[in-house]
């Protein structure tokens, strides 16, 4: 079952958290669910060059809280936070409510090459530039190894290198335990639009195992970080708190 099911949904409540956190009645649930989809689509389309890994949404009363995990936070924040205001107005326009309070928190991804979505996006960009898929996968594996991941699996399907018959090929480096629930497996699905058609890209990244008592990911054989290492940047928007 671990080979077929979505790794994120399989581990919800164990090592993975829900991307949307809110409660709604049966009448308002469809509307809020559609809002979440519109918000994520708008952000991914507007900031396609910002390397956005994930968009977390939380709702409290009439307040909407967003957490954007990105590889390039400066692209979103802009000069003196002007990008945050532009993003807020765009979200309010997307959901059709100009009075909705929107709080935005931008978090920098600490290890870009260890993030499944960013790796899948990198592979898609290379394939759209007509780079050979085997070379692209090999480069992605090397980047992930330098980032210190314990295992990586990449699968690409479609008309590879312009072949007449579509096929699927995959490769794996290290351990990727799909059946182990305590294993923290980051998963992403991406599409690459090439001149020969659409290629599907799937990436699994194994980062370690979460122990039940400590609730911490402890990579096997990982080198501990130095105390003086650089911390990821975090930009929190508090402009709506006084309103």
UniProtKB/Swiss-Prot annotation:
Any Pfam family: KH_2
Domain of life: Bacteria
Disulfide bonds: none
GO BP annotation list: translation
Listed Gene3D superfamilies: 3.30.300.20, Ribosomal protein S3, C-terminal domain
GO MF entries: mRNA binding; rRNA binding; structural constituent of ribosome
Domain KH type-2: start-end pairs: 39-110
Function: Binds the lower part of the 30S subunit head. Binds mRNA in the 70S ribosome, positioning it for translation.
Protein name, as recorded: Small ribosomal subunit protein uS3
Organism: Prochlorococcus marinus subsp. pastoris (strain CCMP1986 / NIES-2087 / MED4)
Organism classification: Bacteria, Bacillati, Cyanobacteriota, Cyanophyceae, Synechococcales
Gene giving rise to this polypeptide: rpsC
